[in-house]
Design a protein with these regions (language model features):
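Active-site-adjacent mobile loop/cap segments within catalytic or ligand-binding domains
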Residues: 304-312, 371, 386, 392-399, ...
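Pro/Thr/Ser/Gly-rich low-complexity, intrinsically disordered linker/stalk tracts
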Residues: 507-550, 584, 598-617
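A glycine-rich, often tryptophan-bearing local segment used as a flexible ligand/cofactor-contacting loop or short
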Residues: 740-846, 851-852, 882, 886
Length: 896
């Protein structure tokens, strides 16, 4: 009896110690707990750690989601086995516009500083960089703020469409009928607090089929008001018999991409499929088709499909925000997405600020409830397993030169230190520590300096409320100029986002005891050349990531578009080159991504080719516009800040990051909040999207050349020329695109119109009777040293004579044309705000003039070579017809 009693006691002690084991294994890694000084090495460090799983506790244990992903793109040419495929992540940028009941006005949650505010700035990290990186690794990403920087919104639905959009049902065998649950329906005008659009209408359903002849479809054909990029959201109802492979086909500019959606989860809300280019109008080349064809026996349901992020439509205090929905807080998106009233209205309708904070994590729990990761809460069954809030915060260095840097936040002391699955909340601390350590390491190794701040364990809503591992990353101080000097540079934001993506990858795979591979960087030295009568060879060079040994590419995806159509879904090739045959007279466009087991890189620049005939001359178009940068920097003894009016910088594609021009530059006002404080600025740009560098301007040039119908055309990156890969001497004519390229002292990357190497190459080309066309906004102002001025004079036959503000002088004339260029910030094309004045040097002459008669274009018709130099970017000419006519005139002049 005594032996049995002691055996029972020993068993109890063993169970108690076992219950503490997971906490012990975690706390051993935490400096604040084990007594070590706070270091900078996170728990997860290397591929070896992840693959061998030595010394690392697999926190999820046997908890694993084994079903189909919520959404999967089956048109993707590559397979992801060591990335984030079938991982579901919740992620958001901080804050957003909200209604302040105390003031009776819509306001930002954070002040305008250095041209932006936190509500806008953190989106420029998350939307163009972090979310795509995670998706390229195979993850399904949910964000409780609208992700689409698009003001238009078109809804196609069985209960009513936007404008002239068309909803059509076709039936082969089983008819479409209404579900027993409510569905989406829209109405015109604003929505009152508490109105749920997903309770206002109906949804449709039919039985599935495995046979093509029995296929029934719903066609959602939008009336697109203007050509552009639009997000595509679908909706449906999860019912008894729902399938996990509902097939949606998106037709976008003539191409089609097929998705499988798991309708066994996530019904009754907007489900993101992707973002695509659509043409203006209503036609079968731009639509979404839902099919009942499935490998499973059950039912498929269909409800509204939404194209575009749209404008905010939730009324508070008698008015809507009058801003794009993407700039609003999560509280209002949650209502539009069909979330229950309790998710976004936690303060009785009296405090939208508090509601917005809570809505972010409440949406996570609402979606994840009922999944393996949040099993005891009622919800939509989406297996979200990680939550991250990306913020910036306040604080400044009094010396005006030091960095404030990053900090991370977690919450472990809540619900007895347990998450919904009963695993320890210390897992969130490991995640926060890894984020902070990796960001510090990656930024220091890339840009030499960064400040690591604290790892805080605090009671914050965004880390307390989620029932899955969570963290807040305060990326930097938006109040500290040295921090924002880096933060406003798109290259820095890419590095920051890539570090966060890599941490998420390491963390999730390690917690499941799996190995990982980091997705590659984009290839470089992209070039196209003819290698036969109508054959071209595309070639590029892999880029190795010095920070990540696993990030090497093992293959590549080559994407192609023809005419005005969209890009296809890609063709995989193992070699860094591909040979193709071209059809005569067709305008081709190409871009390339690098691929490995972990995912896919961002794409290269877009290059183009046109084959006319075997006897036609071949023109080489060169892209030399690679610049990404923040605005003009002012940093003197007495002043600091950014001058958006002089140069707003160059974002990567579209940006929503600007609030307004900085007004106070006085360093003595550092730390003052509001008007009169250093960095304070206006709100005149709020709600405006601004286009930056889309890296596809070669196509604008080649399209204009193709309109002449006399020449073959190929293209390359200027980097391929400088590396020696492309020899321009074999081409009778070269068209060099320089856009907004220029050297900027404060930039984190080096850019230059004509580097010494490029000067040497172009000089040699003209000495051998080459024909050269060059266009760009800063050709002269970027070459003000002795060697640069000599190159301008001796090769281009021009002299820099100042700049021209085109906001008051919008027209350019010459070559029997009078035309406008993009000269003001806009959401369609980058703007040449203040291009150079380039005066001709004898015997060259002025061929184009600004409205004030200053020289805008110079032609040199020598017996040795010919050259045509434009002081503004050719691709900034607004009218396609004018571009074609100007290009025809230039080529006739150069090749006569």
């Amino acid at each position: 009896m005594q032996t049995k009693r002691w055996s029972f006691i020993l068993l109890c002690n063993f169970l108690i110690l076992s219950s503490y084991a997971e906490d012990f294994r975690l706390t051993a890694f935490h400096p604040a707990i084990n007594g070590f000084s706070q270091g900078e090495k996170p728990l997860i460090r290397s591929q070896k750690d992840a693959s061998d799983n030595q010394g690392i506790y697999k926190m999820w244990g046997d908890i694993e989601y084994k079903g189909d992903p919520w959404v999967r793109n089956i048109s993707r040419p590559n397979t992801i086995t060591h990335g984030l495929y079938n991982r579901h992540i919740a992620l958001w940028a901080s804050h957003g516009r909200f209604y302040n009941a105390k003031t009776g006005a819509w306001e930002w949650q954070r002040p305008n500083l250095f041209g932006t505010n936190e509500d806008l700035f953190t989106q420029t990290i998350v939307v163009p960089y972090l979310i795509p990186m995670l998706q390229n690794a195979g993850a399904v990403v949910f964000t409780p703020r609208e992700r689409d920087w698009q003001k238009n919104e078109i809804i196609v639905d069985n209960d009513g469409n936007t404008d002239a959009s068309v909803y059509t049902e076709t039936t082969a065998k089983d008819i479409w009928r209404s579900t027993n649950t409510r569905g989406f329906a829209q109405h015109t005008g604003a929505y009152a607090n508490g109105e749920n659009p997903f309770e206002a209408g109906t949804a449709r359903m039919t039985k599935t089929t495995t046979k093509e002849r029995n296929t029934s479809e719903i066609v959602y054909r939008p009336q697109i008001p203007e050509a552009g990029r639009y997000v595509v959201y679908v909706s449906y109802q999860t019912v008894a018999g729902s399938i996990s492979d509902a097939q949606y086909t998106i037709f976008h500019k003539g191409q089609k991409t097929v998705f499988k959606v798991n309708q066994q989860m996530g019904g009754g809300t907007w489900v993101y499929l992707g973002t695509f280019d659509f043409d203006r109008g209503c036609n079968p080349y731009n639509q979404v088709v839902l099919s009942n064809k499935s490998s499973q026996h059950g039912v498929v349901t269909g409800d509204a499909v939404r194209f575009g992020g749209g404008m905010g439509n939730i009324q508070r205090g008698g008015d809507v925000s009058n801003l794009p929905r993407s700039l609003e807080g999560a509280r209002y998106y949650a209502q539009w997405a069909g979330a229950p009233y309790s998710v976004y209205n936690t303060k009785g309708g009296e405090d939208d600020y508090g509601d917005d904070i809570n809505a972010r994590s409440n949406m996570v729990n609402w979606l994840a409830g009922g999944s393996v990761f949040v099993p005891s809460l009622e919800g939509k069954g989406v297996p979200l397993e990680l939550s991250l809030a990306v913020h910036s915060d306040a604080g400044f260095a009094e010396n005006g030169t030091s960095l404030v840097g990053s900090l991370a936040i977690c919450t472990t002391d809540y619900n007895d230190g347990r998450l919904n699955t009963n695993i320890s909340r210390m897992i969130s601390r490991d995640f926060a520590d890894a984020l902070l350590s990796d960001v510090t390491r990656d930024i220091r190794q890339t840009y030499h300096d960064w400040a690591r701040r604290d790892l805080l364990d605090r009671n914050y809503s965004e880390t307390r409320n989620p029932e899955i591992p969570s963290a807040i990353l305060e990326t930097m101080s938006h109040q500290n100029f040295p921090d924002m000097l880096r933060g406003q540079d798109p290259n820095f934001r890419f590095t920051l986002a890539r570090s966060i993506y890599k941490t998420i990858l390491r963390f999730i795979t390690t917690q499941h005891g799996q190995s990982y591979t980091v997705e590659p960087l984009a290839p470089t030295d992209f070039a196209i050349a003819f290698v036969g009568k109508n054959k071209i060879k595309l070639s590029w060079t892999a880029v190795q990531d010095s920070l990540e040994p696993t990030a090497s590419p093992t293959s590549y995806n080559v994407y192609m578009a023809t005419g005005t159509g969209g890009f296809n879904n890609g063709r995989r090739t193992k070699r860094p080159s591909l040979t193709l045959e071209l059809e005569p007279g067709v305008h081709y466009r190409f871009k390339v991504t690098a691929v490995n087991r972990g995912g896919e890189s961002f794409p290269t620049e877009v290059l183009s080719a046109v084959y006319r005939s075997n006897t036609a001359k071949t023109i080489l178009v060169v892209n030399g516009f690679h610049r990404l940068s923040g605005p003009t920097v002012i940093n003197t003894e007495f002043e600091q800040g950014f001058d958006l009016n002089r140069d707003a910088g160059v974002s990567e594609g579209l940006t929503a990051g600007w609030a307004g021009a900085q007004q106070c530059f006085d360093k003595s006002c550092m730390g003052i909040e509001g008007p009169g404080g250093l960095g304070f600025g206006g709100d005149e740009m709020a709600g405006r999207f601004v286009m930056g560098n889309t890296f596809d301007y070669v196509a604008t040039h080649t399209e204009a050349i193709a309109s002449v119908a006399r020449y073959n055309v190929v293209s390359c990156s200027s980097r391929a020329i400088e590396s020696g890969k492309v020899q321009i001497g074999t081409y009778p004519c070269v068209d060099l695109i320089l856009g907004l390229e220029k050297f900027t002292p404060s930039a984190l990357r080096f850019y230059k119109t004509f580097t010494p190497k490029m000067q040497k190459i172009l000089r040699a080309y003209t000495q051998k009777h080459g024909r050269l066309m060059v266009s760009g906004a800063y050709l002269g102002s970027d070459q003000t040293n002795t060697n640069g001025e000599r190159f301008l004079a001796e090769v281009l036959k021009v002299k820099f004579s100042g700049t021209n503000r085109l906001d008051t002088l919008p027209y350019i004339k010459g070559m029997e044309q009078e035309f406008e260029i993009y000269q003001a910030l806009n959401d369609k094309h980058y703007a040449a705000i203040a291009p150079d004045i380039l005066e001709p040097l004898t015997p060259a002459y002025c061929a184009l003039r600004y409205q004030n008669e200053q020289s805008a274009g110079v032609a040199y018709d020598g017996s040795d070579y010919k050259c045509f130099t434009m002081a503004f970017p050719f691709e900034c000419i607004r009218s396609p017809k004018v571009r074609n006519d100007i290009m025809r005139g230039i080529l006739t002049y150069l090749l006569k």
